[in-house]
Amino acid sequence: MPEYNIEMFPAITPKDNPFKIAEKKGIPIDLFKEGYSRIENCVSAFLSHHSLWEKCYEEKTEYQIFEHDAVCTNNIPKFIPYQGCISLGAPSYGRFETPMKIGVGPLSSKRYFPGAHAYRLKPVGAKTLLHRAKTDARPT
């Protein structure tokens, strides 16, 4: 099993005034208004991820990002071919898209990014996410 250097990152919380942070970064919060979560918590979680995207892009290094409650149930390979960002697992909610055939074929997932609980990110992917956050920020 590959070994990884794991570094805990201090999360942004509602005590940090996430609305002010989002405004300062030019991130709209309109799409965070939904019926399942408290908006302050959603914006805080998003900004925690956003901070790591900034670090990934600035440091020009690949990141693996795990939320505090992510559970690894299998080995994560060192090398995974991907473009900018790839989910490393399956969320505990929603339906999965089942491949139409067994064997080698394209990866299948959901129509949207299947959760932010565990993912790998390249600087080019971080740049894309940072750009999209200016217009399309929503709960992670």
What are the language-model segments listed below?
Residues 1-66, 70-140:
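An acidic/histidine-cluster motif and surrounding catalytic segment
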